[in-house]
């Protein structure tokens, strides 16, 4: 699958309103000191299980393993019940994306805006 956005793309962000499940957002990942552009997969009340890199949303499989996350990954099995201030983000190219499977849920305060369109 081809990436939707590439490093260096200029994106127009909507910075008001609350992003919804399915929206593509730009979020700052403090632990890694960079901004990611990912889709919101889960919101408040959703239950996420990550097992061997596969992601299950409320019990249904929605994503395949990220390269290098299968088998002995230290994040082999995680469970999240999302609180009102959290999102679980997933990349469009799920086989290679570094997303919430790698860095966990993100707080709503980390979201810089919802992507409206790519300008350049």
Regions found by a protein language model. Give the residues of each.
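Extended hydrophobic leader/signal-anchor segments used for secretion and membrane insertion
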Residues: 1-120
